[in-house]
Swiss-Prot record:
Gene: rpsN
Protein's recorded name: Small ribosomal subunit protein uS14
Function noted in UniProt: Binds 16S rRNA, required for the assembly of 30S particles and may also be responsible for determining the conformation of the 16S rRNA at the A site.
One Pfam family per UniProt: Ribosomal_S14
Keyword Ribonucleoprotein: yes
One Gene Ontology MF term: structural constituent of ribosome
Oligomeric form and interacting partners: Part of the 30S ribosomal subunit. Contacts proteins S3 and S10.
NCBIfam families: PRK08881.1
UniProt key word DNA-binding: no
High-level lineage: Bacteria, Pseudomonadati, Pseudomonadota, Gammaproteobacteria, Moraxellales
Amino acid sequence: MAKKGMINRELKREKTVAKYAAKRAELKATIANVNATDEERFDAMLKLQALPRNASPVRLRNRCGLTGRPHGYFRKFGLSRNKLRDTVMQGDVPGVVKASW
């Protein structure tokens, strides 16, 4: 089980990313716009750099929904490999069966 502080930190990052998503997209569009003047693009770059670091979606980490474990994460299920195995063996995940050949 991950520390509660780490899980809370990740939730805080998710909220920050959602809060600044529109502003980041607008600034990035201005920077990528070829028709914008150099001054506008430079100002947009400075404003983008002034945003909080945790506003960038790159800083998010996928974590297990049950334990908060950051490694061995399966996106399709939202669980780590350990908890995925446990839930599949209990029959809690529909459509998943143990491999047999």
